Amino acid sequence: AENLPAYRLELVPEKVNDLDGTIQALGRIIDLPEDALEKFQKNRSRHRVFDSVPLKFNLTEAEVARFAVDRHNFAGVEVVPYLARHYPYGELMTHVLGYVGRLDENDLRRVDAGNYRGTTHIGKSGIERYYEDQLHGLSGVEQIETNAQGRVLSVLERQDPEHGDDLILSLDVQVQQAAWDALGERAGAVVAMDPRDGSVLAMVSKPSFDANLFVHGISADKFREILNAPDRPLFNRALLGGSEPGSTFKPFVGLAGLELEVITPDKQVFSSGNYYMPGGSRPYRDWKKGGHGWVDIYGALEQSVNTYFYQLAYELGIDALHGYLTQFGFGDRTGLDLLGENRGVLP
């Protein structure tokens, strides 16, 4: 994520004689969508008297130029430069980085509102939200004395702002891109970790969406389109989805069998290609037609023999297996520094 220079249109309602007429006149030189006007009215209610209220973000160069020509006709209205959040990797990183969006009443209830005076955006999801306090820093304050015309006479008090922290992530863009490409057109998730320290090198959830759409305020129509898409691009499959662990689960079952002395390293089980629960008639199949023959734990792991681990899990029993697997974090959250992670399911 990076910050890029941009311009926003804002006004001080108390300094505008005819607010409705002024907004209509502004609409003739600057495109003001209905969504922007609705957000302006909502923002007015939470701003203090004589505070500037944003009317539109991310003005085009043409809009800035047109306003500059007619600026003398708009008392109390200003075009203000600011730094806008930009996500150069677009949808590739959205589900892990998250995004910032317009500050609203719900946001103010979870932060120190006094530290967000003059702030228009806040972390809404992902890394941006989890580390909001560190990234935001401290707002500056300046108390001034003015005359009746609004001219500054003196500065009574000043507290300089403090820059937020920079974050260096463990993510590797090349690994992230490789994971993204590997999924192709399929919906799914890929997480790549460094086994030496558990750091996350890639976290992909697909399909995704472009976080830049939310920075300046997404239109209601566009949001409905994304929200109602059948492939659910807003759903973070890496963080919220539940998937069977597949054969990656087998080493843990094998280790449980060894440590609880249900098997020995040289105990062999015959794999015929099908496994039947005692008293049952439903076959649970091996991946290899005809099975693998006699295998011990080494061969079962090497060849990923399904039937060996079906039998071992049955001999362990659900209570012993459950108790052992909880030691490895199955059925719990990982503690990843992202909000909203679901727990795993462990019978």
Annotate the PLM regions:
Residues A1-A189, V204, S208-R237, G242:
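Extracytoplasmic/periplasmic proteins that interact with beta-lactams or build/remodel peptidoglycan
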Residues T146-R158, P195-T248, F252-P347:
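Beta-lactam-recognizing serine transpeptidase/beta-lactamase-like catalytic domain environment
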